[in-house]
Amino acid sequence: MEASAGLVAGSHNRNELVVIHNHEEPKPLKNLDGQFCEICGDQIGLTVEGDLFVACNECGFPACRPCYEYERREGTQNCPQCKTRYKRLRGSPRVEGDEDEEDIDDIEYEFNIEHEQDKHKHSAEAMLYGKMSYGRGPEDDENGRFPPVIAGGHSGEFPVGGGYGNGEHGLHKRVHPYPSSEAGSEGGWRERMDDWKLQHGNLGPEPDDDPEMGLIDEARQPLSRKVPIASSKINPYRMVIVARLVILAVFLRYRLLNPVHDALGLWLTSVICEIWFAVSWILDQFPKWFPIERETYLDRLSLRYEREGEPNMLAPVDVFVSTVDPLKEPPLVTSNTVLSILAMDYPVEKISCYVSDDGASMLTFESLSETAEFARKWVPFCKKFSIEPRAPEMYFTLKVDYLQDKVHPTFVKERRAMKREYEEFKVRINAQVAKASKVPLEGWIMQDGTPWPGNNTKDHPGMIQVFLGHSGGFDVEGHELPRLVYVSREKRPGFQHHKKAGAMNALVRVAGVLTNAPFMLNLDCDHYVNNSKAVREAMCFLMDPQIGKKVCYVQFPQRFDGIDTNDRYANRNTVFFDINMKGLDGIQGPVYVGTGCVFKRQALYGYEPPKGPKRPKMISCGCCPCFGRRRKNKKFSKNDMNGDVAALGGAEGDKEHLMSEMNFEKTFGQSSIFVTSTLMEEGGVPPSSSPAVLLKEAIHVISCGYEDKTEWGTELGWIYGSITEDILTGFKMHCRGWRSIYCMPKRPAFKGSAPINLSDRLNQVLRWALGSVEIFFSRHSPLWYGYKGGKLKWLERFAYANTTIYPFTSIPLLAYCILPAICLLTDKFIMPPISTFASLFFISLFMSIIVTGILELRWSGVSIEEWWRNEQFWVIGGISAHLFAVVQGLLKILAGIDTNFTVTSKATDDDDFGELYAFKWTTLLIPPTTVLIINIVGVVAGISDAINNGYQSWGPLFGKLFFSFWVIVHLYPFLKGLMGRQNRTPTIVVIWSVLLASIFSLLWVRIDPFVLKTKGPDTSKCGINC
């Protein structure tokens, strides 16, 4: 899609369009050659799935299947090059020492049931060719087929030599002839194999070797690898978890069998809370059983897909940026995000940036226009000097030596000029913001005098404007810029718009019509690209021929700027991103967290991952004790749908084709062009499509009624039903059998802003928790959804269940935080007097908790300070935001009372941490304040009671005081937040404190702790001699 001359606004019926030029036709890809075995010289061949056979996933040493199987059966079972033990691959028999792997599931080959004679015959034939040369001539390949390296990706094969077909250009390397032996005999094969092994170390490069052989071998190797946690770190951690589970069971048994008869209410409440905490701990702990890390190889990605002199074969990527309210999400923040996207280290023709303005704000539109103009200067500057990060606001405010590693003589001069250009750009944006603060009575007017179509934000047509791209002009150095598209979907009264999820689905459809990239990057407007190679990092997984087929998305961790040094309110959330997410990556992949995620478009369309040969389900029919019938899978997959469409023909075929097209329209909507794009797995727009028709369809697919009677939001795209649509969307993909990847490059891929103010932070946590409660009560709850097919792994289900259950922990947590004060005020306790033996249970439990935390920090690299801040805010958020989320969720489910969430403000104060000390009153502050005062009153009452009754009461008091102080210490950051910068409590909090203190003072007087508890004779009756 090319840059248009003006804004395109209209609905499906209005047909308001502008004329644009033809789209650039996609460049053809070249056919590429195959590979040959380093041992016998035979062609390596294909796997059972049609991919190039790779014997060793670690080094990619070229070996054909017969040599690979012989080495596993008769040899050392190790790769000749890297000495790594060969793993069993699909289509090969098992040997002693093989591990069970769920992805290799072919019983017909696994136990070597048949085809033994065929394999020996093929081996003998391969050796005959191996004596002659390192490859075959064109006459040996009857069909002219070459094994594709890019599985499920772009069409075309990977080059291993110069040309195709003749000896001069092909890969042609002489090898020493093997000793003559009967070609078909097993002994001859073994003799030649052993001879090759003995001579392998002495075979040096020949004079006529291809100089690119080293690069080719490097390009054949995997684009990424798993890095398991060292066994010395993870094994003790697992043993302590098991020990803690046993200790917890013994502790709970003791608690249940030893009630406190004079305080049954307190005892029963505490036991129920402890059981709930145990269940919550299990759901949180065991998904961290298999943590892994990953490494990517960007150089191999370039060697494989960016070969010199050939078309760039990296996959196109559509980038989505969403914004709603420019007053809470400043245009300057959004502009920096867009500029960092346009300046990414990725081919410009492969990048398209779509900005969704769900508030239909003219301020956002005009600021994006200014951003497009500034990008013509900023993008070439970034690429010329390779600066990081490529968001100008963050780059120019970095307090580092910006001259480090810079050798270009004009860098300083051009940097100063660019900084001045950016400052002028900021002034223009600020002027637009100031102008937008006063809305005219007649509404906004565009520069050409026409009214702004989005003056009524709840009733306006769809709008599209293409700012940059193929026909949008060039940068200051004459180079093309990535495409930049402004999108505002149509809104009309009476239609449900589904907030952010609906806006994202509209972007998916618009991009599907205009560019249709096979991959999509989703970013919030305040999350800029901090690592210009972030998309390349994701492509190392998504375009990997071995693992990319079943990957639905690559999730990056969230990192933040502008957080205070102590991270008072645990904004960095490193415990979740550096511990929990690594654990999930070892199971079925991390959950989707709403931003910083690269999706596979086909996964968002509801398709299932491609299926390889699977072991048949053993459903015995009674006629055979070993084998059964294969269970039929009635779920539709993309391959089935493509096959059905391709098989149609004749009169009946036309009828079936019509029915199939109607089914597609019921699924994807009534846009034939968009439906066609969903079947293009490799992406791209049909060359025959007219740009005017594409623009008309783009307006159509963002119309307010397009999703009616379709599966958008239920099975396709971002899933509706919760304000935390990210959890639901990732959950649906995992239930279909996809897996996700967690990518943590050394330089953080994306960075955003976090609410450092206490009230804003609690409101953010409230929104997340409310979304979890909505999912818990919906039909997509992990407790009962997704069991059919068994594609969601159990530990992954545990993790998803924990994401929906955790808000309910607020109820027992609140009760447990109040119990210490009640015990101090009533002089009772939740446990009976314990013996020396029983005290071992408590000591063991506390020790196991401490050791588990220490070992977890050891393998994850999280600091103890970050862990402690997370624990503190877990209590603060648990007794405030999570509690309110449960109440609001129940009101919404039971009474139908809906609660609208507010967008978290991204504005910054002139002071670096001005927002940190600002006090904003919210009802979320009431429960923690109440708990804090109750415990302080309880501590004072307990100490006064002990002083009044003598030293014999100090022993039992220490346990109660420790219990209460533990609660107060967890709430300390909350107390500092209430005090603010001036270390004085705001008036509203003082009023609440006095009110609550008065209530508990009356309660204290009723208990009367200063009066002697022992009863004696009445002096009025016995006289002075009593």
UniProtKB/Swiss-Prot annotation:
Q: Which residues are glycosylated?
A: N900
Query: Which residues act catalytically here?
Result: D358, D726
Catalytic activity line of the entry = [(1->4)-beta-D-glucosyl](n) + UDP-alpha-D-glucose = [(1->4)-beta-D-glucosyl](n+1) + UDP + H(+)
Q: Which InterPro entries match?
A: Cellulose_synth, CES_Znf_RING, Nucleotide-diphossugar_trans, Znf_RING, Znf_RING/FYVE/PHD
UniProt-reported outcome of changing C621S: Unable to localize to the plasma membrane and impaired function as cellulose synthase. Abolishes S-acylation
Q: Which Pfam families match?
A: Cellulose_synt, zf-UDP
| Enzyme Commission identifier(s) | 2.4.1.12
Compartmental location: Cell membrane
Residue ranges that the UniProt entry lists as topological domain Extracellular: 253-262, 826-836, 894-922, 976-984
Quick one: which pathway?
Glycan metabolism; plant cellulose biosynthesis
Give, from the UniProt record, the effect of changing C1026S. Impaired function as cellulose synthase. Abolishes S-acylation. Unable to localize to the plasma membrane
- PTM remark: Phosphorylated protein may be subject to proteasome degradation.
| Co-factor remark | Binds 2 Zn(2+) ions per subunit.
- Please list the cofactors this protein needs: Zn(2+); Mn(2+)
Q: Its Gene Ontology biological processes?
A: cellulose biosynthetic process; plant-type cell wall biogenesis; plant-type secondary cell wall biogenesis; rhamnogalacturonan I side chain metabolic process
Residues holding Zn(2+) 2: C56, C59, C79, C82
Where expressed (tissue)? Confined to secondary cell wall developing tissues such as xylems and interfascicular regions. Expressed in young plants, stems and flowers, but not in leaves, roots and shoots.
Span-the-membrane segments of this chain are 234-252, 263-283, 805-825, 837-857, 873-893, 923-943, 955-975, 985-1005
Q: Where N-acetylmethionine occurs, residue numbers?
A: M1
Topology term for the membrane = Multi-pass membrane protein
Give the family per the record: Belongs to the glycosyltransferase 2 family. Plant cellulose synthase subfamily.
> Mind telling me which PANTHER family this protein's record contains?
X-BOX TRANSCRIPTION FACTOR-RELATED
What is this protein for, i.e. what is its function? Catalytic subunit of cellulose synthase terminal complexes ('rosettes'), required for beta-1,4-glucan microfibril crystallization, a major mechanism of the cell wall formation. Involved in the secondary cell wall formation. Required for the xylem cell wall thickening.
Q: How does it assemble?
A: Interacts with CESA4 and CESA8. Assembly with CESA4 and CESA8 is required for functional complex and localization in secondary cell wall deposition sites. Interacts with STL1 and STL2, but not with GOT1. Binds to TED6.
Which protein are we looking at?
Answer: Cellulose synthase A catalytic subunit 7 [UDP-forming]
As recorded in Swiss-Prot or TrEMBL, the protein's gene is named CESA7
